[in-house]
Amino acid sequence: MPTPHNSAKKGDFAKTVLMPGDPLRAKFIAETFLDEPKLVNNVRGVQGYTGTYKGVPVSVMASGMGMPSIGIYSYELFTQYDVESIIRVGSAGALQKDLKLGDVVAGMGACTNSNYAAQYGLGGTFAPIADFQLLSAAVESAKELGVRMDVGNLYSSDTFYDASNPSLKWADMGVLAIEMEAAALYCNAAYTKKRGLSLCSISDNILTGEELSPEARQTSFTAMMKIALETAVKMVAESQK
């Protein structure tokens, strides 16, 4: 059934959804990689499409920016549209010098400065982590595609312009990259007993100052998208065994 943020009908979304932040990137992914993509949502300009990839139904829908936004869209997909897996395909700022522009990282865990998990009333600190089966399928897909993919912790920040500039401290802890969505996705997946994974392509390096142009961010993340799509195919094949 439609929600205040999604006009799609039940059954319009595939079991696996790729979730970029930018609606224009969602459109690009659908039109570039999916066969017969159909627009199923455009509320607030947050575009959602469903098509097929190698004969497998796959959807792509934008999340917007930040944990509150992906928190809404991923929760509704999990609970109202029977989506089983959401793979975030976004951008991130590298916190390690050996990560180059365009490199792909997979968030095994998501450190955060957010209190998103406070809603669960836990008597401690919840550790948001990726679904192991999704992560394993992504690692296997990257190897098959010959794409380098670093796996480790991401740092999901509530603030883009952070006055305290904590990035170097997180880098000292071996965190690979900083972004703004993974922790909320992982929390929602855990709470709803579904699957979440965050793949990010490096758009800039916090330590070196290198960065991609806004235009390149939209279209240059082909390797990451192929890993995500091949992961979706593997998940369907696994479910049919």
Predicted regions and their residues:
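Flexible, glycine/charged-enriched surface loops at secondary-structure junctions
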Residues: D35-N42, G146-N153, M235-K241
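Active-site rim beta-loop-alpha module in soluble metabolic enzymes
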Residues: T125-G174
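Zn-dependent metallopeptidase/amidohydrolase metal-coordination segment
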Residues: A183-R217
